[in-house]
């Protein structure tokens, strides 16, 4: 079985064609037929839904109690402000949570670059427009940035954190957001050829990130996530082996050894093998009378066997429960 698995083709060529720092095309070939879609679909789903990243998840705005408010002198209403904050590509390099602020007075255009950062944050798209202020406009915000995986759903937060809802301070606006740094993913499967084989796959993955990580790093992380999730299946044989070892440990290790290790005379050894006695554990369960019924095994051979067993603190006629172990001979 393992020989057949080892004979399967594994990819020999991995090409990364960068169209920009955050957009790339990754080509993997050759793959056995069908593996292009198997791997492509799995990686695409992970890239879109399960990648770790950072996002703004909460905003406190001076003078605003809920998201259906408006702010004097600000062109955008609060809902639009929150939507714009969702588009801020921010990278946390230290810790899993941080607070940042934004304080601006009009007339001006407020961009992501106006956000005042503390230690360990980086904004990738500082040109992103958040709001437009006129002469009377004033915008003071405190923003919460968190690291996470996949999509941050405020409805789920409310549903599963009822005890915290009571503690929630009025004016803290929760923001639905995606932590995933991947914006777009698509994969294509084409035919590939190796020598005379033409039934192989070539997998091409096109992806674009928000800039907090590059495309090559994104594909590497997604492959690592898939590998970790499949590790339990790979380890099944190891767990089975540990169970076998436990079973074997119930017996004296000497009993699991071959009768050849007793170094009997050729005559005695051949007689035992003719009776399908291959392990010392098989031998010690036989009685003297049973062995004497063995063709060509006389009293001299019997005495030899008894003496050799006695030198190992063993004897004939022993009772061994659950013998033989299921894993014996593997």
From Swiss-Prot:
It catalyses: RNA(n) + a ribonucleoside 5'-triphosphate = RNA(n+1) + diphosphate. The keyword Transcription applies. The keyword DNA-binding does not apply. One of its GO terms (molecular function) is DNA binding. Keywords: DNA-directed RNA polymerase, Nucleotidyltransferase, Transcription, Transferase. SUPFAM superfamilies: C-terminal domain of RNA polymerase alpha subunit, Insert subdomain of RNA polymerase alpha subunit, RBP11-like subunits of RNA polymerase. Its EC number is 2.7.7.6. NCBIfam families: PRK05182.1-2, PRK05182.2-5, rpoA. This is DNA-directed RNA polymerase subunit alpha. It comes from Legionella pneumophila subsp. pneumophila (strain Philadelphia 1 / ATCC 33152 / DSM 7513).
